[in-house]
Structure formats: structure tokens, C-alpha cells
A protein has these predicted regions:
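Short, Lys/Arg-enriched anionic-surface-contact patches
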Residues: 79, 143-156
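Glycine- and acidic-residue-biased ligand/ion/polar-headgroup-sensing regions
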Residues: 38, 49-62, 77-80
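Short, Lys/Arg-enriched N-terminal segment that forms or immediately precedes the first helix
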Residues: 8, 136-146
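A generic structural motif
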Residues: 62-64, 103
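Cyclic-nucleotide recognition modules
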Residues: 72-131
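Cyclic nucleotide-binding regulatory module and flanking cytosolic helices
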Residues: 1-31, 87-89
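Phosphate-/nucleic-acid-contacting segments
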Residues: 151-201
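Short phosphate-coordinating micro-motif centered on Lys-Gly-acidic
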Residues: 41-46
Length: 201
């Protein structure tokens, strides 16, 4: 087993019990795939037939707005899964609800929809795993909406590093601004205000 699959298998067994034979069978039905920086590998409206597990790199999930910019809903980093949010109904020809773009060169494990169906049908705890993965995404999106609607910009900025460690050193500041729902200028002023506040303590 490669170290890449060890990372994925560790993710799985943190949440459900699986035998070595089940993990081996699952790994054999997946593939390691690489994407270039800037590559959009999931596109809104296109059929989604796989989910991805990040081994290395950062991804943003976003939509284009009607005013010519984009709105970032979340980031995905090492050890996280990526999906266009349509996949977990386990139906064929589901269309992605967001775009997924690599901010860095990325290496991922591709998990085809047929593999997910196989796991849920034939593995002892496969259905539980599928349910956990679906619920995790729903909970994450609910937390995003709640934070957006109830927390101040400064509070959301302060939790950014907790949600995505070291991400500010790895991605353009305009993307952080998009995630927070503010302009890059506003973000720059916010960071300066934060530094000034810390210096006064």
C-alpha cells in the first residue's frame, strides 16, 4: 500500500471500522491523479461521477456571480475530500453545484461513483461511511452559512486559521477576501487593524 492510500485509509478508519481486505479492495478501485495549478476539475452543471481526496495541494469551491467575480464557499486542503455537492445522492448523471479549482499543483485520489456504490452495498460499514461523508459536507455548509450570517467579518477572519491552518501563506489574499465576502482593500485594512490591536496589548 502506498503512503497516499495510507492517508486515505486513516481518514476512513477514524470514522468507521473496516477490515484490511475491505480497505485493499477499496484502494484497488481508486486511482491517484494529478492536476495543474489553476485547473478546474469539477465544473458547475457538468455530470459528476467521482469525488476526490486531497493528498497534496489546495482547492477552492466557488461559483461565478452575475457581476463578473466569483464567490468562494470553502477551501479544501490535505486530508480533505472534494465534491461538487451533487454526488451524495448516489444517482447517475448528477450535475455539480460548484466549481472546484486547484490553487496549487494537486495530487489526489479519485474515487469513482461506482466505487462508492460498491462500498455502500457490499462493505459491512459502507453505508455508514457514505452517510458520514454526506453529513460532513452538509454540516460544513451549514456552519459556513451560520458564521456568515451571525459572525462579524473580524470573527470569521480570526477563525480562518483554525479552519484552514497555514492557508494564508499559500493562497492569494483576494481569495481570502472572496471567502469572507469583502474586498481585498477591506481585508488589507482589517489585517492592519488586527496587527495594531495586538501591538497595543
Amino acid at each position: 500500500m502506498s503512503n497516499h492510500f495510507k492517508m486515505l485509509n486513516s481518514f476512513i478508519i477514524r470514522h468507521v471500522e473496516m477490515s484490511e481486505a475491505e480497505l485493499k479492495s477499496f484502494n484497488e478501485k481508486c486511482e491517484i491523479i494529478e492536476f495543474s495549478k489553476g485547473e478546474i476539475f469539477i465544473k458547475i452543471g457538468e455530470p459528476q461521477d467521482s469525488l476526490f481526496f486531497i493528498i497534496k495541494g489546495i482547492v477552492r469551491n466557488y461559483v461565478d456571480t452575475n457581476v463578473g467575480d466569483s464567490k468562494i464557499y470553502n477551501f479544501r486542503t490535505e486530508g480533505m475530500q472534494v465534491t461538487g455537492y451533487a454526488l451524495y445522492n448516489y444517482k447517475d448523471s448528477l450535475k455539480a453545484l460548484v466549481n472546484s479549482q486547484c490553487i496549487e499543483e494537486c495530487k489526489m485520489i479519485k474515487v469513482p461513483l461506482q466505487t462508492i456504490k460498491y462500498v455502500t452495498e457490499y462493505f459491512k460499514n459502507g453505508e455508514r461511511l457514505g452517510r458520514y461523508m454526506a453529513e460532513a459536507h452538509v454540516i460544513e455548509m451549514m456552519n459556513y452559512i451560520i458564521k456568515r450570517d451571525t459572525k462579524s467579518i473580524i470573527e470569521r477572519y480570526d477563525t480562518l486559521e483554525l479552519d484552514y491552518p497555514n492557508i494564508q501563506q499559500r493562497i492569494p489574499q483576494r481569495m481570502i477576501a472572496s471567502y469572507l465576502g469583502i474586498t481585498p482593500v477591506h481585508l488589507s485594512n482589517l489585517k492592519k487593524s488586527r496587527r495594531d490591536s495586538i501591538d497595543k496589548k
